[in-house]
Amino acid sequence: MTASAPRRPAAFLDRDGVINYNDHYVGTRERLRWMPGIAAAIRQLNAAGYYVFIITNQSGVARGMFSEDDVRALHRWMLDELNTQGARIDDVRFCPHHVEGTLDAYRVACEHRKPGPGMILDLAKTWPVDMTRSFVIGDSASDVEAAKAAGIPGFRFEGEDIDVFVKQVLIEMQRAAVSN
């Protein structure tokens, strides 16, 4: 991304519990079950002019369940699958660390691990993001806390229809923009 590109808002989406079901330690496509309506939700964000990013804690790496390469391969496949449905993900960040990991190299506290804002802030530095109009959607308190730590709103998705949920978030963000 070039620094001269116009700033756009971003939707930072948690992976497990928003993009796909949270089936714990999903490291391969064989274990991934898409959240119904996710492609439509992402297309909605694309049409509204948002960058769409995935931010995800992947402690399965720290626990030796799968490798960083496995996670990257899964993410490439996910982005390709979504793209065939006209749903574009612009970038992905994941944190493989966990203080209780079984692999020494990954047993560390890391600002990128949610609730830390590291993944959000890294993407905002890499892409021309308008943080004043950006938000996070996640399924846990740590996702909302990461949003707050990054200075943006966080919305907690609890398994309803993700397409309808995204529509409601976009309406709320538009209302907030008008009232400011």
From Swiss-Prot:
Q: Which reactions appear under catalytic activity for this entry?
A: D-glycero-beta-D-manno-heptose 1,7-bisphosphate + H2O = D-glycero-beta-D-manno-heptose 1-phosphate + phosphate
Q: Which domain of life is it from?
A: Bacteria
InterPro entries in UniProt: HAD-like_sf (IPR036412), HAD-SF_hydro_IIIA (IPR006549), HAD_sf (IPR023214), Heptose_bisP_phosphatase (IPR004446), Histidinol-phos (IPR006543)
Residues bound to Zn(2+) = C95, H97, C110, H112
> Under which EC number(s) is this enzyme classified?
3.1.3.82
Active site feature: D14 (nucleophile), D16 (proton donor)
Q: Would I find rRNA-binding among this entry's keywords?
A: no
Give me the Gene Ontology terms describing cellular component.
cytoplasm
Functional pathway? Nucleotide-sugar biosynthesis; ADP-L-glycero-beta-D-manno-heptose biosynthesis; ADP-L-glycero-beta-D-manno-heptose from D-glycero-beta-D-manno-heptose 7-phosphate: step 2/4; Bacterial outer membrane biogenesis; LPS core biosynthesis
Chief place where the protein resides: cytoplasm
Q: Does the keyword Metal-binding apply?
A: yes
Which residues are recorded as binding substrate?
D14, R15, D16, N22, D23, H24, Y25, T56, N57, Q58, S59, R113, K114
Subcellular location, in the record's words? Cytoplasm
Name the residues that bind Mg(2+). Answer: D14, D16, D139
Q: Tell me which residues are marked as the site Contributes to substrate recognition.
A: R113
List site positions: Stabilizes the phosphoryl group.
T56, K114
| UniProt GO molecular function | D-glycero-beta-D-manno-heptose 1,7-bisphosphate 7-phosphatase activity; metal ion binding
Family in the record: Belongs to the gmhB family.
Subunit composition?
Monomer.
List the PANTHER family hit by this protein, alphabetically. D-GLYCERO-BETA-D-MANNO-HEPTOSE-1,7-BISPHOSPHATE 7-PHOSPHATASE (PTHR42891:SF1)
State the protein's purpose. Also catalyzes the dephosphorylation of D-glycero-alpha-D-manno-heptose 1,7-bisphosphate in vitro.
Protein's name according to its UniProt entry: D-glycero-beta-D-manno-heptose-1,7-bisphosphate 7-phosphatase
**What organism is this sequence from?**
Rhodopseudomonas palustris (strain ATCC BAA-98 / CGA009)
Q: What is the lineage of its organism?
A: Bacteria, Pseudomonadati, Pseudomonadota, Alphaproteobacteria, Hyphomicrobiales
